[in-house]
A protein has these predicted regions:
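Short, low-hydrophobicity acidic/polar segments
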Residues: 11-178, 185-190, 194, 198, ...
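Short, polar/proline-rich extracytoplasmic segments that appear immediately after membrane translocation
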Residues: 12-28, 40, 291-338
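Sec-dependent N-terminal signal peptides
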Residues: 1-3
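C-terminal motif of bacterial Sec signal peptides marking the signal peptidase cleavage site
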Residues: 5-8
């Protein structure tokens, strides 16, 4: 099982104009994503905070897209004397009880954010030192705060072994954190640059289900993506090391697949047997570690996408049919006279 990190780039701006030239206006961009996620075209609203001289100027104001323009109420105006304004934006909008942007370096902006079902693409944007004299429109370039996940499965294939048929019923993650504190950078998140958010105090490990549906049959070498629940966004985190205890229990971050393996030509089941741990309805779980000493990826970073390619074969420890060959010698019947 491997991981591939995929990058992205930004779309064009959606610009707006207000009648009052001194009002604070916004334009919005969102980085492209390799899969279904929020984009410049699909984002519809965000929350914004603003600070002047360290004092709160806008407090969790909801900005909504209406006919390709961004509107909010009440309209805010640029401060006098060309004073700088720092803007912090989050999408989708966050309840006031959950967001505590304070414009202080190192202080979390969202505390206790919970990634409940992995379907929300959380975005953030920062605009520092904007002034009326230099800023006609606040160009808000959002970045993805979470990590995006994709899981592909395929059967093991080798010229040295008989072809396999694999049946998969479910796929889930084990022991990944679902709650944490988000801190936005104190630098402008422009289209270029690597000013990323950071996460801290990750907690509440859970085991989200990625796929649970009809049996998927793997009978060729083409990979199949599994996702029936919509879970594709995970909390950035250092993955808990994957270990197996002496009691055969797993600890740490794993992918768990409920499956069965057959010989393709004869249809004979090769794994699991009825004595396999966790055996149920002809299937059992295979475990694939996410974080070991040899793993190429041991953490999920904000704004990165990870594609896990899982190859399923006959598990290690299963009995291979070997042959020990002997040939009986011909019996000596002696000499026969005819």
């Amino acid at each position: 099982m491997g991981a591939v990190v995929i990058g992205g780039c930004s779309n064009d701006d959606l610009n707006i104009n207000f009648d009052d030239e001194n009002a604070i206006d916004f334009s919005v961009t969102v980085p492209r994503s390799p899969r279904t996620a929020t984009t410049t075209e699909s984002i519809n609203e965000f929350s914004v905070w603003a600070f002047v001289d360290g004092n709160k100027f806008m407090d969790n104001v909801t900005v909504v897209k209406n006919n390709n323009s961004w509107q909010y109420s009440p309209t805010m105006y640029w401060p006098a004397d060309d004073k700088a304004v720092n803007f912090y934006s989050i999408s989708p909008k966050i309840p006031k009880s959950e967001a505590t942007v304070v414009n202080t370096p190192g202080t979390p902006d969202i505390t206790g954010y919970t990634n409940t079902d992995g379907t929300t693409d959380l975005l953030y944007a920062v605009n520092m030192d904007e002034t009326a004299g230099t800023t006609s429109v606040v160009k808000v370039n959002f970045r993805h705060a979470l990590s995006q996940l994709q899981f592909n499965v395929r059967r093991y294939s080798s010229d040295a072994t008989s072809p396999l048929r694999v049946e998969v019923k479910s796929l889930e993650l084990l022991n990944v954190y679902s709650k944490g504190n988000l801190t936005m950078p104190r630098q402008t998140t422009g289209i270029s640059g690597e000013n990323l958010s950071s996460w801290s105090s990750q907690s509440e490990p859970n085991s989200p289900v990625i796929y649970d549906g009809n049996v998927v049959v793997l009978d060729n070498d083409n990979p199949v993506e599994l996702n029936s629940t919509g879970y594709m966004f995970a909390l950035p985190q250092t993955l808990v090391p994957s270990v197996t205890s002496a009691s055969a229990s797993v600890q740490g971050a794993y992918v768990r697949v409920l499956c069965a393996v057959y010989d393709q030509e004869s249809g004979v089941k090769l794994w699991p047997s009825q004595t396999t741990q966790g055996y149920s309805d002809g299937m059992a779980y295979l475990y694939f570690p996410l974080s070991t000493s040899g793993s190429s990826v041991k953490e999920w970073r904000p704004g990165y996408a990870y594609r896990y390619n899982i190859t399923i074969g006959v598990p290690a420890g299963s009995s291979v049919i070997d042959f020990d060959v002997t040939v009986d010698g011909y019996k000596d019947f002696g000499n026969l006279d005819i």
